[in-house]
């Protein structure tokens, strides 16, 4: 219940909507590189909805801010988005080279957030009094999650092993921790483990019930998209597209267009298609297409998994049209981030 604790903490602080706007956006931006943009956007939008008291004038800019922050935060980390993960595992951009995208990502989020801030109502929601504490083992599981990400990076960087092996190693440690936590619900272990009366009332922890919550339909969607793109490559269409785009327009213009296409088609199939085309580009251009594909999905609510997920959290106020109204502001941040990319990356 880590995010229930976060929600309780925000409610107790008695922050106004303007401060909550920045708090939820900043937390999303910092969480996204570790937990990925979809997870961070979904969880933080739930938190924002909880503290909104149903105020639509706060929900719309806050949700858009969360989507932009999630995609921007995920663009500079190998684990922040499926697109960055694909670029990283293909060897186009190395682990530490993603840091070049940190400043462009910050600009991509800060500019639209700074403009939307003036439309956030200057009100204070009713403060909550509920007290939520971490469940037993919560802090250890948080540590294991961070350790798993570090292990996957280390396996790939130093041992030249596939990143999934580091992830599976971390999952194994989580299973062992889950076995230990199951004993909290068994009375015969209460005295041996020195549990208090409050701790004894916690339900049994079962890792398999958590795994059941994985969205396998999303995984099947990815399999279908990647198979379709592979078929286009096989029959030669990707080669024609690559020649017409990168051959005629040049790498920079083409990579900027890729970001716009990501907002319309979804960034994952677009990035996979670029990787299948494998145009001759230097590090600076691979960083650009990684940035544009990642943050370009923020232009429309359907352009990224984060945006689609957030639309499902609150359909009454936040939808395709309410997001579209702010597209020019988001586009301003998109173009500014490209300008910063030009200044900070080696050419």
Predicted regions and their residues:
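Short amphipathic alpha-helical coupling elements at transmembrane boundaries
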Residues: 5-15, 50-53, 210, 242-247
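Hydrophobic alpha-helical transmembrane segments
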Residues: 18-26, 63-64, 98-103, 139-146, ...
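Hydrophobic alpha-helical hairpins/lids featuring a short glycine-rich hinge
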Residues: 3-38, 46
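Hydrophobic core segments of alpha-helical transmembrane domains in multi-pass membrane transport
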Residues: 28-29, 106-117, 142-154, 170-178, ...
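Flexible loop linkers connecting adjacent transmembrane helices
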Residues: 1-14, 127, 316-322
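Juxtamembrane and boundary regions of transmembrane helices in multi-pass small-molecule transporters
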Residues: 56-60, 76-77, 86-87, 93-140, ...
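Transmembrane helical segments that form the transport core of multi-pass membrane transport proteins
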Residues: 152, 156-285
């Amino acid at each position: 219940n880590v995010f229930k604790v976060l929600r309780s903490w925000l409610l107790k602080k008695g922050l106004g909507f303007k401060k909550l706007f920045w708090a939820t956006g900043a937390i999303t931006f910092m969480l996204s590189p570790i937990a990925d943009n979809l997870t961070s956007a979904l969880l933080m939008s739930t938190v924002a909805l909880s503290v909104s008291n149903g105020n639509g004038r706060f929900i719309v800019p806050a949700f858009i801010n969360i989507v932009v922050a999630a995609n921007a935060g995920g663009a500079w980390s190998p684990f922040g988005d499926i697109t960055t993960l694909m670029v990283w595992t293909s060897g186009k951009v190395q682990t530490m080279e993603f840091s070049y995208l940190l400043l462009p990502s910050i600009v991509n989020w800060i500019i639209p957030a700074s403009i939307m801030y003036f439309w956030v109502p200057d009100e204070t929601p009713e403060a909550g009094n509920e007290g939520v504490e971490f469940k037993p083992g919560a802090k250890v599981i948080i540590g294991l999650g961070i350790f798993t990400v570090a292990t996957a990076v280390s396996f790939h960087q130093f041992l030249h092993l596939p990143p999934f092996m580091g992830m599976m190693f971390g999952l194994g440690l989580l299973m062992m921790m889950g076995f230990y936590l199951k004993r909290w619900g068994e009375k015969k272990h209460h005295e041996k483990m020195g549990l208090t009366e409050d701790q004894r009332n916690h339900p049994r922890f079962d890792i398999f019930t958590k795994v059941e919550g994985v969205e396998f339909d999303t995984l099947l969607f990815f399999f279908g998209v990647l198979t379709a793109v592979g078929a286009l490559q096989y029959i030669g269409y990707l080669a024609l597209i690559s020649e017409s785009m990168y051959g005629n327009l040049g790498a920079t213009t083409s990579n900027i267009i890729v970001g716009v296409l990501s907002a319309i088609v979804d960034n994952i199939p677009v990035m996979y298609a670029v990787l299948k085309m494998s145009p001759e580009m230097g590090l600076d251009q691979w960083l650009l297409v990684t940035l544009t594909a990642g943050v370009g999905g923020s232009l429309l609510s359907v352009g990224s998994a984060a945006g689609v997920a957030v639309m499902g959290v609150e359909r009454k106020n936040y939808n395709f049209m309410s997001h579209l109204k702010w597209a020019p502001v988001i586009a301003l941040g998109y173009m500014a981030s490209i300008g910063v990319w030009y200044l900070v990356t080696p050419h």
